[in-house]
Amino acid sequence: MDPESFGLDKTAIEICNSYMPVLDIEPRLIREGFKSLYDIQKKHISKTKQYQLNKENGDSLMDVHFFYPSGYEQNPVDHKYKAIFYIHGGGFMVDGIKKLPREISDRTNSILIYPDYGLTPEFKYPLGLKQCYQLFTDIMNGNFNPFNDLINDSISIVGESSGGNFALSLPLMLKLNNSTFFKKISKVLVYYPITDCNFETPSYNRFSEKFYLTKEGMKWCWNHYTNNDSERDEITCCPLKATIDQLKDFPETLVITAETDVLSSEGEQFGLKLSNANVKVSVLRILKTIHGFVSLDQTNDSIACRVGMDLSMNFLNNISNNSIINENNNKTLLKLL
């Protein structure tokens, strides 16, 4: 099965054909290769503040980036913004590309909070997630508002790929700990999230190789992320393993998947499980595209990326997506599950 047979656009096909799994390279060297994509100041307003992690979460300083929407500098000094807590992807081991958080901040007129959480294998499960949890709770209780411009009475959580795993696990962790902040999460948005470690799903078997993200590549990421197999039974490691009761009262959620992605089945299964728990959830599969289609710079101008971004920004902005879903031009591009 080849990428060409799925009607992928030229750029997506080039990504699939040029990408080679790097299973024999140290994670730190992979990070070096991505450094050119990390210029967070490029074309956007951002500030960075160091945040002190507790001893049990690394006992170190973590950089937290704050992305600001266009027009921020023209607003009064005391103007406050709603907040979005954004968790980047990268297979648990690579820093995220900054294109997506920039656009989300701009199109929602929000301050987007972007933690540089500890990456595996130096910070294995659950350290990165616990760092995000500590930061999130300190933002919500007012202990970390370094520029005094955040509204923290409610917040949305957004994550992509492995960051989507964290974005789904964080509310579950809050609920398990009986945190009052669980109820303050207004929405959860995840793009092609990792929700499980089952490598025999329909999408894993159908798109196991040749489609950018591979089955062997994901096994490699998981082996670096967890300390042992028993951790993979925990719902904050594999959210799909949460029971219906554990998912009750989960925040309103939008799950966006990519058709030719090994992760599409597990993301959609998680959405179905939320629905079975009577959670308000929408699951949208974007057809003819690959994993990473909204976050990769190369696919930014693709129809799939633009439709995916329009759908997700409407969701965060409380605008109906019916018109996009019903447009004739999009009927061959997306599937509502």
From Swiss-Prot:
Induction: By cycloheximide.
One GO cellular component term noted in the UniProt record for this chain: phagocytic vesicle
Catalytic residues of the enzyme: S161, D261, H291
A GO molecular-function descriptor: hydrolase activity
Gene3D superfamilies noted in UniProt: alpha/beta hydrolase (3.40.50.1820)
Keyword annotations: Hydrolase
Pfam families associated with the record: Abhydrolase_3 (PF07859)
Keyword check for Hydrolase: yes
InterPro entries noted in UniProt: AB_hydrolase_3, AB_hydrolase_fold, GDXG_lipolytic_enzyme
Residue positions of motif Involved in the stabilization of the negatively charged intermediate by the formation of the oxyanion hole: 88-90
SUPFAM superfamilies hit by this protein: alpha/beta-Hydrolases
Family: Belongs to the 'GDXG' lipolytic enzyme family.
PANTHER family tied to this protein: AB HYDROLASE SUPERFAMILY PROTEIN C4A8.06C (PTHR48081), ALPHA_BETA HYDROLASE FOLD-3 DOMAIN-CONTAINING PROTEIN-RELATED (PTHR48081:SF8)
Name of the protein described by the UniProt record: Vegetative-specific protein H5
Gene encoding the protein: cinB
